[in-house]
């Protein structure tokens, strides 16, 4: 699909289908829409009247254009109230257009939406993202793909100018999102710690990233007892992955992104039982997948920021070598942990990863993890929890998420709740009381950061969509690659 920006007037464009964004309660035709309506035989006014189209957010309607018009299809998309227009409105509207264009089997399409905040570049990028991500289908594991090959070949975004840089950036970011989606969607017999590390190797080779992979013996030398405690039950070797993007000049900032990378989580000896969603636990490396997705995008966009990508990849399995409930592990910072639940393993792998990241002497660390069901209970499937020791960092991420159209909610770091993690025989337990479980998980991770500004993103809900939702089709979403990229770029 070739996406292009253009100043070609609406009345001069020729192709198969035109998509128009309409504000709520502003369906009366004026200006060039009146002229276009006359050109195509009154189809716009007729469609608005017959469909009782009001322009409400999320609404859409399409029809065939009769007569001798070279334009065969018309698509109207509701953008909601004019004063509430955002980049996300445009992004979601573009996703609707893309799906309707595919359904209507058009090859060439023009889309005309209003420019948000007089920023044609950002508006163009949002439209491109909405179209690319909504049309992505992962058919790798089907013998006969359900969908026929995509018909949509060319999309012209009208009224924005050429905008090749904005479109290229959107395509690059989407390539990172799609990598994350495909890693999360792939089963655990395809994406293992070994193949996950191979993905990192391919990124390093293709995009000029520095790569260090610590094998088990090196992790032992570094005393990563928390990470290795989780890893020891698996027949597959753990892989501690460290990718680095370095700009050509002096970096204005150094950042670290740390992703939880459990390629499968059985729960360990605290085995996940029937009804617990064990079959979905291939997605427990969603944080690591997004970390590699962000690495792919950032390496191509080349910001003047040094970024370290850290993934402690392993499985949480059962065997005679498995860690027991009640075991005490020692992390690489010397902190001891009583394992009172082997199914709270992600935080154990992150503990050593955070210690490693801080030793890189970066200016800020962000970790992301499908960490707790408690966060889903609190915020649902569409919103990620955000905890931080630094107010400025939290606001940076929140701002980046709003630009990306990915939702975060800043959560409390209630220090008193750490009382629930105290152990009589170790420095802490790995889980606390049921109440406030996502907060105690964040407090646990905080014990492995000394002074560096740090934020924790619990992405357990948004990493997967059970049904079509916005720019996401059912399946892995690639959340929050776009937020991470926006954060680094800004």
Swiss-Prot record:
Positions annotated to bind Mn(2+) 2: 260, 265, 284, 345
Cofactor binding note of this UniProt entry: Binds 2 manganese ions per subunit.
Domain of life: Bacteria
Localization: Cytoplasm
InterPro entries: Leucine_aapep/pepB, Macro_dom-like, Peptidase_M17_C, Peptidase_M17_leu_NH2_pept, Peptidase_M17_N
Cellular-component GO terms for this entry: cytoplasm
The keyword Protease is assigned to this record: yes
Catalytic activity: Release of an N-terminal amino acid, Xaa-|-Yaa-, in which Xaa is preferably Leu, but may be other amino acids including Pro although not Arg or Lys, and Yaa may be Pro. Amino acid amides and methyl esters are also readily hydrolyzed, but rates on arylamides are exceedingly low; Release of an N-terminal amino acid, preferentially leucine, but not glutamic or aspartic acids
Binding-site positions, Mn(2+) 1: 265, 343, 345
Function: Presumably involved in the processing and regular turnover of intracellular proteins. Catalyzes the removal of unsubstituted N-terminal amino acids from various peptides.
Protein family: Belongs to the peptidase M17 family.
Matches recorded under NCBIfam families: PRK00913.1-2, PRK00913.1-4, PRK00913.2-3, PRK00913.3-5
PANTHER family given in the database record: CYTOSOL AMINOPEPTIDASE, LEUCINE AMINOPEPTIDASE-RELATED
Protein name per UniProt: Probable cytosol aminopeptidase
Gene encoding the protein: pepA
